[in-house]
């Protein structure tokens, strides 16, 4: 039997994204939301859904906006006062993320999540950066605080979450012809038994 969990990531990215996620949650489409705590619209987004019955995760972000900790402490992932862009990560042939630095930022975002929400995240994961050091840093911080780490998969291989194999499909949202409905249909048609 196919089981699909549809997660809306990037709560906090902007007010427009926040309103879209709020609507999808309140219409019953989404019950799993990834929260970016480092953005200007973070608290706005949280306030829109804080009373909803939703699984809220810490969606750790190192490629858009300003970091939570001092940028001078994390030069491998910042450019000036902002994070390096996702384009810089994608175009690099090597992992330039320094593990010790990214752990500082991951920890800071975890603490900011607790400050804003007053609770632990229901799960812990990262925002679409294919960096082994970023993923390792997420695992280290998750283990340090006994958090449910949901992992990241960029090649279609399943990740283990709560002893359950989960297949992730983000679709290619940067494509000029991206169609979320078509992506959803393809995702369902290609889904394997178990969680997708």
Label every PLM stretch briefly.
Residues 2-65:
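Active-site beta->alpha N-cap acidic-glycine motif
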Residues 14-22, 102-112:
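Short, acidic/polar
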Residues 21-27, 43-55, 72-81, 114-117, ...:
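Acidic (Asp/Glu)-rich catalytic clusters
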Residues 55-62, 79-85, 196:
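Non-cysteine beta-strand/loop elements that form the S-adenosyl-L-methionine
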Residues 67-97:
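Active-site gating loops and adjacent loop-to-helix segments of metal-dependent hydrolytic enzymes
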């Amino acid at each position: 039997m196919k089981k699909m969990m549809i997660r809306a990531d990037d709560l906090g990215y902007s007010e427009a994204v926040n309103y879209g996620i709020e609507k999808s949650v309140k219409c019953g489409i989404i019950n799993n939301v990834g929260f970016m705590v480092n953005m200007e619209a973070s608290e706005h987004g949280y306030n829109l859904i804080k009373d909803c019955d939703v699984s809220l995760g810490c969606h750790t972000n190192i490629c858009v906006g300003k970091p939570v900790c001092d940028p001078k402490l994390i030069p491998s992932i910042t450019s000036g006062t902002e994070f390096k862009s996702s384009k810089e990560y994608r175009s690099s042939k090597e992992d330039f993320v320094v593990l010790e630095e990214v752990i500082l930022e991951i920890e800071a975002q975890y603490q900011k999540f607790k400050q804003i929400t007053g609770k632990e995240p229901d799960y812990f994961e990262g925002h679409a950066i294919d960096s082994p050091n970023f993923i390792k840093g997420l695992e280290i911080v998750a283990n340090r605080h006994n958090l449910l780490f949901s992992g990241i998969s960029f090649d279609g291989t399943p990740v283990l979450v709560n002893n359950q194999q989960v297949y992730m499909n983000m679709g290619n949202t940067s494509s000029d012809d991206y169609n979320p409905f078509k992506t959803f249909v393809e995702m369902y048609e290609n889904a394997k038994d178990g969680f997708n």
